[in-house]
From Swiss-Prot:
An essential GTPase which binds GTP, GDP and possibly (p)ppGpp with moderate affinity, with high nucleotide exchange rates and a fairly low GTP hydrolysis rate. Plays a role in control of the cell cycle, stress response, ribosome biogenesis and in those bacteria that undergo differentiation, in morphogenesis control. Pfam families: GTP1_OBG, MMR_HSR1. Signal peptide: none annotated. Its cofactor is Mg(2+). It is found in: Cytoplasm. It comes from Rickettsia massiliae (strain Mtu5). The lineage of its organism: Bacteria, Pseudomonadati, Pseudomonadota, Alphaproteobacteria, Rickettsiales. HAMAP family: GTPase_Obg. One of its GO terms (cellular component) is cytoplasm. It comes from the Bacteria. GTP binds at residues 166-173, 191-195, 212-215, 279-282, 308-310. This is GTPase Obg.
Protein backbone atom coordinates (compact mmCIF):
# COMPACT_ATOMS: atom_id res chain seq x y z
CA UNK A 1 0.00 0.00 0.00
CA UNK A 2 1.25 3.48 -0.85
CA UNK A 3 1.92 5.82 2.07
CA UNK A 4 0.12 9.07 1.23
CA UNK A 5 0.08 11.84 3.84
CA UNK A 6 -0.89 14.93 1.79
CA UNK A 7 -3.91 15.30 -0.51
CA UNK A 8 -6.17 18.06 -1.81
CA UNK A 9 -9.81 17.18 -2.46
CA UNK A 10 -13.06 18.86 -3.50
CA UNK A 11 -16.16 18.39 -1.35
CA UNK A 12 -19.74 19.58 -1.79
CA UNK A 13 -22.86 19.18 0.29
CA UNK A 14 -26.13 17.98 -1.18
CA UNK A 15 -28.50 20.65 -2.47
CA UNK A 16 -31.91 20.97 -0.88
CA UNK A 17 -34.88 19.72 -2.89
CA UNK A 18 -37.33 22.21 -4.39
CA UNK A 19 -40.72 22.87 -2.89
CA UNK A 20 -43.73 21.55 -4.80
CA UNK A 21 -46.68 23.41 -6.34
CA UNK A 22 -49.71 21.15 -6.05
CA UNK A 23 -53.45 21.38 -5.26
CA UNK A 24 -55.65 18.93 -3.49
CA UNK A 25 -57.66 16.76 -5.85
CA UNK A 26 -60.64 14.80 -4.61
CA UNK A 27 -63.94 13.63 -6.05
CA UNK A 28 -66.69 16.23 -5.77
CA UNK A 29 -64.16 18.90 -4.76
CA UNK A 30 -63.41 21.14 -7.74
CA UNK A 31 -60.97 23.51 -6.19
CA UNK A 32 -58.92 21.93 -3.43
CA UNK A 33 -56.43 23.97 -1.49
CA UNK A 34 -52.64 23.98 -1.98
CA UNK A 35 -50.92 20.80 -0.80
CA UNK A 36 -47.41 21.09 -2.22
CA UNK A 37 -44.83 19.52 0.11
CA UNK A 38 -41.41 20.82 1.08
CA UNK A 39 -38.16 19.72 -0.49
CA UNK A 40 -35.86 17.41 1.45
CA UNK A 41 -32.64 18.62 3.05
CA UNK A 42 -29.44 17.82 1.22
CA UNK A 43 -26.87 15.49 2.72
CA UNK A 44 -23.97 16.83 4.76
CA UNK A 45 -20.26 16.06 4.32
CA UNK A 46 -18.80 14.47 7.44
CA UNK A 47 -15.24 13.34 8.16
CA UNK A 48 -14.68 10.52 10.65
CA UNK A 49 -11.45 9.19 12.15
CA UNK A 50 -10.85 5.46 11.75
CA UNK A 51 -8.07 3.61 13.59
CA UNK A 52 -7.98 0.93 10.88
CA UNK A 53 -6.50 3.46 8.41
CA UNK A 54 -2.91 4.71 8.39
CA UNK A 55 -2.66 6.53 5.05
CA UNK A 56 -4.69 8.92 2.86
CA UNK A 57 -4.28 6.67 -0.18
CA UNK A 58 -8.09 6.46 -0.62
CA UNK A 59 -8.02 10.09 -1.74
CA UNK A 60 -5.11 9.84 -4.13
CA UNK A 61 -7.08 9.04 -7.28
CA UNK A 62 -10.64 10.03 -6.39
CA UNK A 63 -10.63 13.68 -5.40
CA UNK A 64 -14.22 14.89 -5.90
CA UNK A 65 -16.87 14.03 -3.31
CA UNK A 66 -20.50 15.20 -3.25
CA UNK A 67 -23.26 14.34 -0.80
CA UNK A 68 -26.71 13.34 -2.05
CA UNK A 69 -29.25 16.01 -2.97
CA UNK A 70 -32.58 16.20 -1.21
CA UNK A 71 -35.64 15.13 -3.21
CA UNK A 72 -38.21 17.63 -4.42
CA UNK A 73 -41.44 18.02 -2.49
CA UNK A 74 -44.53 16.08 -3.61
CA UNK A 75 -48.28 16.48 -3.66
CA UNK A 76 -50.53 15.69 -0.71
CA UNK A 77 -48.17 17.68 1.52
CA UNK A 78 -45.49 15.02 1.21
CA UNK A 79 -41.98 16.26 1.84
CA UNK A 80 -39.11 15.12 -0.31
CA UNK A 81 -36.71 12.59 1.13
CA UNK A 82 -33.55 14.04 2.66
CA UNK A 83 -30.29 13.27 0.88
CA UNK A 84 -27.83 10.86 2.47
CA UNK A 85 -24.87 12.43 4.19
CA UNK A 86 -21.44 11.56 2.85
CA UNK A 87 -19.10 10.12 5.51
CA UNK A 88 -15.40 10.15 4.62
CA UNK A 89 -13.08 8.08 6.81
CA UNK A 90 -9.54 9.30 7.54
CA UNK A 91 -6.71 8.02 9.77
CA UNK A 92 -6.29 9.27 13.32
CA UNK A 93 -3.82 12.16 13.15
CA UNK A 94 -5.39 13.71 10.05
CA UNK A 95 -5.66 17.48 9.96
CA UNK A 96 -8.10 19.33 7.70
CA UNK A 97 -6.90 22.66 6.35
CA UNK A 98 -8.35 25.30 4.06
CA UNK A 99 -7.28 24.99 0.43
CA UNK A 100 -4.30 27.31 0.92
CA UNK A 101 -3.23 25.37 4.01
CA UNK A 102 -3.31 28.44 6.27
CA UNK A 103 -6.43 27.70 8.34
CA UNK A 104 -6.75 24.54 10.45
CA UNK A 105 -10.38 23.43 10.34
CA UNK A 106 -10.11 20.24 12.40
CA UNK A 107 -7.56 17.90 13.95
CA UNK A 108 -8.43 14.23 14.56
CA UNK A 109 -6.57 12.91 17.61
CA UNK A 110 -8.87 10.09 18.77
CA UNK A 111 -10.72 7.23 17.11
CA UNK A 112 -14.30 7.48 15.82
CA UNK A 113 -14.41 11.28 16.00
CA UNK A 114 -16.80 13.01 13.58
CA UNK A 115 -16.61 16.49 12.10
CA UNK A 116 -19.39 17.93 9.93
CA UNK A 117 -17.53 20.23 7.57
CA UNK A 118 -20.45 21.11 5.25
CA UNK A 119 -24.16 21.06 6.07
CA UNK A 120 -26.59 20.02 3.39
CA UNK A 121 -28.78 22.68 1.81
CA UNK A 122 -32.23 23.33 3.29
CA UNK A 123 -35.25 22.13 1.37
CA UNK A 124 -37.49 24.62 -0.41
CA UNK A 125 -41.03 25.37 0.76
CA UNK A 126 -44.10 23.97 -0.97
CA UNK A 127 -46.98 26.19 -2.02
CA UNK A 128 -49.05 25.15 1.01
CA UNK A 129 -46.94 27.59 3.04
CA UNK A 130 -48.11 30.56 0.98
CA UNK A 131 -51.89 30.25 1.31
CA UNK A 132 -53.47 33.39 2.76
CA UNK A 133 -56.84 35.07 3.09
CA UNK A 134 -56.21 36.96 -0.13
CA UNK A 135 -54.59 34.10 -2.02
CA UNK A 136 -56.30 30.75 -1.56
CA UNK A 137 -54.50 29.09 -4.48
CA UNK A 138 -50.87 30.22 -4.39
CA UNK A 139 -48.55 29.01 -7.10
CA UNK A 140 -45.52 30.16 -5.23
CA UNK A 141 -42.87 27.79 -3.89
CA UNK A 142 -39.19 28.18 -3.12
CA UNK A 143 -36.21 26.33 -4.50
CA UNK A 144 -33.90 24.28 -2.35
CA UNK A 145 -30.75 25.86 -0.96
CA UNK A 146 -27.54 25.29 -2.92
CA UNK A 147 -25.06 23.63 -0.58
CA UNK A 148 -21.57 24.91 0.11
CA UNK A 149 -18.61 23.55 -1.83
CA UNK A 150 -14.89 23.86 -1.21
CA UNK A 151 -11.42 22.51 -1.85
CA UNK A 152 -9.62 21.37 1.27
CA UNK A 153 -6.16 20.09 2.16
CA UNK A 154 -5.77 16.89 4.20
CA UNK A 155 -2.50 16.36 6.05
CA UNK A 156 -1.68 13.26 8.08
CA UNK A 157 0.57 13.47 11.13
CA UNK A 158 1.20 10.03 12.56
CA UNK A 159 0.47 9.61 16.25
CA UNK A 160 3.33 7.99 18.12
CA UNK A 161 4.77 8.18 21.62
CA UNK A 162 8.39 7.89 20.51
CA UNK A 163 10.14 9.11 17.38
CA UNK A 164 13.34 7.52 16.06
CA UNK A 165 15.67 10.05 14.44
CA UNK A 166 19.19 10.01 13.08
CA UNK A 167 21.27 10.00 9.93
CA UNK A 168 20.42 7.58 7.12
CA UNK A 169 21.79 4.13 7.93
CA UNK A 170 22.11 4.89 11.65
CA UNK A 171 20.25 1.67 12.47
CA UNK A 172 16.75 3.02 13.14
CA UNK A 173 14.89 0.37 11.14
CA UNK A 174 16.89 -2.43 12.78
CA UNK A 175 16.07 -0.93 16.19
CA UNK A 176 12.37 -0.80 15.29
CA UNK A 177 12.29 -4.38 14.00
CA UNK A 178 13.87 -5.67 17.22
CA UNK A 179 11.65 -3.87 19.72
CA UNK A 180 8.38 -4.30 17.77
CA UNK A 181 6.72 -6.69 15.37
CA UNK A 182 7.11 -4.16 12.55
CA UNK A 183 8.90 -5.40 9.44
CA UNK A 184 10.61 -2.37 7.88
CA UNK A 185 12.80 -2.78 4.83
CA UNK A 186 16.40 -3.02 6.03
CA UNK A 187 19.60 -2.90 4.00
CA UNK A 188 23.12 -1.54 4.38
CA UNK A 189 22.69 1.65 2.38
CA UNK A 190 21.24 5.11 3.06
CA UNK A 191 17.55 5.90 2.61
CA UNK A 192 16.36 2.31 2.94
CA UNK A 193 13.37 3.74 4.79
CA UNK A 194 11.37 5.77 2.28
CA UNK A 195 8.22 6.16 4.39
CA UNK A 196 7.61 6.33 8.15
CA UNK A 197 7.24 2.96 9.86
CA UNK A 198 5.11 2.48 12.97
CA UNK A 199 5.40 -0.26 15.55
CA UNK A 200 4.00 -1.07 18.98
CA UNK A 201 6.45 -1.83 21.79
CA UNK A 202 5.22 -4.10 24.59
CA UNK A 203 6.90 -3.88 28.00
CA UNK A 204 5.32 -6.32 30.47
CA UNK A 205 1.66 -5.22 30.54
CA UNK A 206 2.31 -1.77 29.08
CA UNK A 207 2.84 -0.54 25.54
CA UNK A 208 3.77 2.48 23.45
CA UNK A 209 3.92 3.39 19.77
CA UNK A 210 7.24 4.16 18.09
CA UNK A 211 7.82 5.74 14.66
CA UNK A 212 10.90 5.28 12.48
CA UNK A 213 11.31 8.45 10.43
CA UNK A 214 13.34 8.38 7.18
CA UNK A 215 16.93 9.49 7.75
CA UNK A 216 17.74 13.16 8.08
CA UNK A 217 20.52 14.90 6.20
CA UNK A 218 21.83 18.44 6.26
CA UNK A 219 19.21 20.78 4.82
CA UNK A 220 16.29 18.42 5.50
CA UNK A 221 14.10 21.24 6.84
CA UNK A 222 14.60 22.98 3.47
CA UNK A 223 13.47 19.94 1.53
CA UNK A 224 16.76 18.11 1.00
CA UNK A 225 16.73 14.33 1.22
CA UNK A 226 13.57 12.82 2.71
CA UNK A 227 13.44 14.44 6.12
CA UNK A 228 11.44 17.56 5.34
CA UNK A 229 8.46 15.55 4.17
CA UNK A 230 8.34 13.40 7.29
CA UNK A 231 9.54 15.60 10.16
CA UNK A 232 5.91 16.52 10.84
CA UNK A 233 5.22 12.93 11.88
CA UNK A 234 7.28 13.26 15.05
CA UNK A 235 5.87 16.63 16.14
CA UNK A 236 3.23 14.87 18.26
CA UNK A 237 5.52 12.33 19.96
CA UNK A 238 6.61 12.65 23.60
CA UNK A 239 10.19 11.42 23.30
CA UNK A 240 12.90 11.29 20.64
CA UNK A 241 15.40 8.45 20.47
CA UNK A 242 18.38 9.84 18.60
CA UNK A 243 20.53 7.09 17.11
CA UNK A 244 24.09 7.98 16.13
CA UNK A 245 26.22 5.73 13.94
CA UNK A 246 29.17 4.79 16.14
CA UNK A 247 31.25 3.85 13.09
CA UNK A 248 31.12 7.45 11.84
CA UNK A 249 34.36 9.41 11.79
CA UNK A 250 32.68 12.42 13.42
CA UNK A 251 29.81 11.50 15.73
CA UNK A 252 29.57 15.05 17.10
CA UNK A 253 29.05 16.53 13.63
CA UNK A 254 26.41 13.88 12.89
CA UNK A 255 24.58 14.70 16.11
CA UNK A 256 24.74 18.46 15.55
CA UNK A 257 23.46 18.16 11.98
CA UNK A 258 20.35 16.26 13.03
CA UNK A 259 19.74 18.60 15.97
CA UNK A 260 19.97 21.62 13.68
CA UNK A 261 17.38 20.13 11.34
CA UNK A 262 15.00 19.42 14.22
CA UNK A 263 15.41 22.89 15.68
CA UNK A 264 15.06 24.58 12.29
CA UNK A 265 11.84 22.73 11.53
CA UNK A 266 9.85 23.73 14.62
CA UNK A 267 10.07 24.68 18.28
CA UNK A 268 8.02 21.58 19.05
CA UNK A 269 10.87 19.35 17.91
CA UNK A 270 13.52 21.58 19.42
CA UNK A 271 12.11 21.09 22.92
CA UNK A 272 11.40 17.35 22.78
CA UNK A 273 12.98 15.12 25.40
CA UNK A 274 15.84 13.28 23.74
CA UNK A 275 17.44 9.92 24.51
CA UNK A 276 20.86 9.78 22.82
CA UNK A 277 22.21 6.40 21.75
CA UNK A 278 25.60 5.57 20.26
CA UNK A 279 24.76 2.65 17.97
CA UNK A 280 26.94 -0.01 16.29
CA UNK A 281 29.14 -0.34 19.35
CA UNK A 282 29.73 -3.97 18.37
CA UNK A 283 32.27 -2.76 15.78
CA UNK A 284 34.11 -0.51 18.25
CA UNK A 285 36.65 -1.22 20.96
CA UNK A 286 35.87 -0.26 24.55
CA UNK A 287 38.30 2.65 24.25
CA UNK A 288 36.65 3.92 21.06
CA UNK A 289 33.21 3.67 22.62
CA UNK A 290 34.22 5.67 25.67
CA UNK A 291 36.03 8.28 23.58
CA UNK A 292 32.99 8.90 21.39
CA UNK A 293 30.61 8.94 24.33
CA UNK A 294 32.81 11.51 26.09
CA UNK A 295 32.80 13.74 22.99
CA UNK A 296 29.02 13.56 22.69
CA UNK A 297 28.38 14.17 26.37
CA UNK A 298 30.63 17.21 26.26
CA UNK A 299 28.52 18.93 23.57
CA UNK A 300 25.10 17.67 24.69
CA UNK A 301 25.41 17.75 28.48
CA UNK A 302 23.26 14.61 28.42
CA UNK A 303 23.88 10.96 29.15
CA UNK A 304 24.78 8.94 26.05
CA UNK A 305 23.88 5.25 25.97
CA UNK A 306 26.03 2.71 24.07
CA UNK A 307 23.94 0.14 22.16
CA UNK A 308 24.13 -2.29 19.28
CA UNK A 309 21.08 -3.02 17.16
CA UNK A 310 23.08 -5.88 15.62
CA UNK A 311 23.64 -7.76 18.90
CA UNK A 312 20.74 -5.99 20.70
CA UNK A 313 23.09 -4.97 23.52
CA UNK A 314 21.62 -2.12 25.55
CA UNK A 315 18.41 -1.91 23.50
CA UNK A 316 16.05 -3.19 26.22
CA UNK A 317 17.42 -0.58 28.60
CA UNK A 318 16.51 2.17 26.10
CA UNK A 319 13.00 0.76 25.67
CA UNK A 320 12.38 0.81 29.42
CA UNK A 321 13.83 4.32 29.70
CA UNK A 322 11.54 5.52 26.91
CA UNK A 323 8.47 4.04 28.62
CA UNK A 324 9.45 5.61 31.94
CA UNK A 325 9.91 8.99 30.25
CA UNK A 326 6.51 8.76 28.56
CA UNK A 327 4.78 7.92 31.84
CA UNK A 328 6.47 10.84 33.60
CA UNK A 329 4.93 13.23 31.07
CA UNK A 330 1.37 11.96 31.46
Amino acid sequence: MHFIDEVKIYIKGGNGGNGCVSFHREKFIDRGGPDGGDGGRGGSVIFRSNHHLNTLVNYRYKQHFTAENGENGKDSNRSGKSGKSLVLDVPIGTQIFSEDGNILLHDFTVDDQSFEIIKGGSGGLGNSHFKSSVNQAPRKRTEGEIAEEMWIHLSLKLLSDVGLVGFPNAGKSTFLSFVTAAKPKIADYPFTTLVPNLGVVYVDDEEFVIADIPGLIEGAHQGHGLGDKFLKHIERCNVLIHLIDGSSNDVVADYNTVRLELESYSDYLKNKIEIICLNKCDVLTDEEIQEKINKLQKVTNKEVFPISTYTNAGVNKIVKLALETIKNQE
